[in-house]
Design a protein with these regions (language model features):
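Active-site-proximal alpha-helix that buttresses catalytic centers in soluble enzyme cores
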Residues: 1-134
Length: 134
């Protein structure tokens, strides 16, 4: 189940699902949880959740199902992946197709992976330049 940031009865229709790979080490997810909290704080009108491809819970399908049960009709999936490998080229489209069939009343869209966002790449590059400056 999604660890709802907003646990009261849903009066919102839109949700954002941050989608990460997952890992065996529970601490691995902390940066993603921090991002979820930051977005939820800045966008209180939006339900913000975190879901995983594997190794951690909730799975994307379980998270979307819970959001639909809670009355969300617009769900945006944001892949928190730096590069498009097999998971984004094969696994995510397959998952999204299945979710769109199972939850036809909800509009499910997907954003570009964060690794394709110019502002993020520029921020990483800037941090690396500053970190190695003498």
């Amino acid at each position: 189940m999604c660890a709802a940031v907003n646990s009261t009865l849903n009066t919102k229709h839109s949700a954002l699902v941050l989608f990460a790979h997952g890992a065996r080490d529970a601490q691995w997810s902390e940066p993603f949880r921090a991002i979820r909290e930051a977005v939820a704080t800045r966008r209180p009108e939006l339900t913000v959740e975190l879901a995983f491809l594997e190794l951690m819970q909730p799975a994307l399908g379980d998270c979307v199902a819970q959001l639909v049960r809670d009355g969300h009709t617009r769900i945006t999936v944001a892949p928190l992946f730096l590069a498009q490998g097999g998971h984004l080229k094969k696994d995510l489209p397959r998952l999204l197709k299945d979710l769109s069939v199972r939850h036809a009343a909800a509009k499910i869209t997907v954003l570009a992976p964060i690794g394709e966002v110019t502002e993020l790449l520029n921020a990483i590059s800037e941090w690396l330049v500053k970190s190695t400056a003498r």
